[in-house]
Amino acid sequence: MIETKVSKGIISTYFEKLERNLDLDVAIVGGGPSGIVAAYYLAKAGLKVAQFDRKLAPGGGMWGGAMMFNQIVIQEEAIDIVKEFNINHEKYEDGLYVMDSVESTSALLYHAVHAGATVFNCYSVEDVIFKNNTVSGVVVNWTPVLREGMHVDPLNILAKIVIDGTGHDLSLIHI
């Protein structure tokens, strides 16, 4: 039956993806623009990178632009990155450019994944693995599990490097 084939396809391929990412070069906590760009450049350099974002849709606050006007403004210093990600943009005033926030966020995610990064959405990092006086991984659980206060054991993911890309929250630092 097609229904069970669909379910088996989702379960088996997701399990394989998760298993492939239990031991990483780099774990990035947070799926905002800085974390996504870091994932892109690190994966492009050949490192095994996974990004963990607590939201259903990674991208941080970029989706909404400013006050849900889905336009964003960037400074001249970031224009080379915008061009590398092939994001449409137009000059606004001296040193400022405007772009569509939805296109921009989508482009960042698309390029990070195509460079080889794996993005896990709806994952919260609830702790870090600390061995030999160094952070050596993250402890993850599904965001809805934590939000509901369920007592469900997390999973451990090893990483040579852990990056806090949680933006304004600095969630990882407060663990």
Please annotate each region the language model reported:
Residues 157-167:
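Short hydrophobic core segments
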Residues 173-175:
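Conserved small/polar residues in nucleotide/adenosyl-binding loops
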Residues 44-62:
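Glycine-rich FAD pyrophosphate-binding loop
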Residues 115-125:
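A conserved beta-strand/loop element that lines the FAD pocket in flavoprotein oxidoreductases
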Residues 65-88:
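N-terminal glycine-rich dinucleotide-binding loop that anchors FAD/FMN and/or NAD(P) in oxidoreductases
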Residues 1-25:
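Extreme N-terminal leader/targeting segments of oxidoreductases
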Residues 129-155:
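Conserved beta-strand-loop-beta-strand element in the redox core of flavoprotein oxidoreductases
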Residues 24-47:
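N-terminal Rossmann-like FAD-binding beta1-loop-alpha1 element of flavoenzymes
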